[in-house]
Design a protein with these regions (language model features):
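Hydrophobic/basic alpha-helical segments
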Residues: 1-346
């Protein structure tokens, strides 16, 4: 890993000499020394675990899988044609090798929390999958949770919308009970931190979904605005949004996507987004060449919601002022003003 001298000594001092005891009824058990592991909840723990499991990529790569790791959560990805009948065996063999590797590293593959999601290329395609590992069977799930986002096999995100709406409604219910004791400003801060933040989390996945699918989330935002001002259920929300300087849900999603597009052009976006939004290069000199436009690919059937298709269109539809020569902070201010006028003042 290239860690030497003082840095290596610092890691060694962090990992060695640890012990623990259990308090019970005012007394503590005998102190036991830890030969492995560090204190649970340590800030450095996830990073050290990622370093410890670096060789996992060699195993997944040998079976043709890509993978992501987030602390102790590992996700494997495999793309295969519909007529491939060997993918079940490939998945089983890969999981079996991972289980053996974990045992050699004093780890354990938790099969009770292992989930399988198959996303077919077309809704009409059905896959009969049965994964066997360590005498246990693993069947495909209709939906799985990925860092708080519920992803279903059809990518409709209906389950995710229902989950977010449920958690937000519960938060609003609790705030409503203490609303008589809160000022308007305190209520606004509480709603923004416990409700609006949930609506904004990973909302880019909701791009171009049917209005009926995302309507529950918009209703949650409407209820949140009414709660801030302590207005009745039927109160009109547009004046409330204007006073709160809140963008409605559709505009918030568009704001998130366009800020990501700016970061892609600025080189500050995650690496995996860079190939999805490329600058438009004309075959001949044009006056529009200085407008900082993005290349719009021709989408295939069923791919109109792809980031690489919808974001360049949104970016090119912006006026030239936000797109050209603005810093990120200025771009966000101009973009919010533009969306505010488009969705609330017209």
């Amino acid at each position: 890993m290239g860690i030497t001298e003082k840095a290596c000594a610092w890691f060694e001092s962090y990992l060695t000499g640890r012990s623990f005891s259990v308090p019970w009824l005012g007394q503590s058990s005998t102190v036991h020394h830890l030969a492995t592991r560090v204190s649970q909840g340590s800030a450095l723990g996830p990073l050290l675990f990622a370093i410890y499991t670096t060789s996992l990529g060699e195993i997944t790569g040998s079976h043709g899988f890509s993978y992501h790791c987030y602390a102790d959560d590992t996700q494997l990805y495999l793309s295969f044609p519909p007529d491939d009948h060997t993918f079940s065996a490939r998945i089983s063999n890969c999981l079996s090798d991972i289980s053996k590797w974990m045992k050699s590293y004093n780890l354990q593959l938790n099969l009770s929390k292992t989930e399988l999601l198959v996303i077919p290329a077309k809704p009409s395609i059905q896959h009969n999958i049965s994964i066997q590992i360590d005498f246990l069977s693993l069947a495909p799930s209709k939906a799985v949770r990925n860092l708080g986002v519920v992803i279903d096999e059809r990518l409709t995100f209906k389950d995710h919308v229902a989950s977010v709406a449920c958690s937000c409604c519960f938060a609003l219910y609790n705030i409503r009970k203490i609303r008589p004791y809160l000022t308007q400003h305190a209520t606004q801060l509480l709603v923004q931190s416990t409700v609006i933040s949930h609506l904004d989390y990973c909302n880019a996945h909701l791009t171009d979904l049917p209005a009926c699918t995302v309507r529950p989330l918009q209703m949650v935002q409407n209820a949140a605005a009414r709660l801030v001002f302590n207005h009745p259920k039927g109160a009109h929300v547009t004046p409330l949004f204007i006073e709160l300087h809140w963008l409605p849900l559709a505009a918030r999603i568009k704001f998130k996507l366009l800020t990501l597009a700016y970061k892609v052009r600025d080189g500050t976006a995650p690496i995996y987004l860079n190939p999805l939004a490329k600058d438009y290069v004309s075959a001949r000199p044009l006056r529009s060449s200085q407008d900082c436009r993005l290349a719009v690919p021709t989408p295939r059937s069923g791919q109109s919601r792809l980031f690489s298709c919808i974001v360049p269109q949104m970016w090119n539809d912006l006026p030239s002022t936000p797109r050209i020569g603005a810093s990120f902070s200025i771009f966000k201010k101009l973009l919010k003003t533009l969306l505010f006028r488009e969705h609330l003042l017209n």
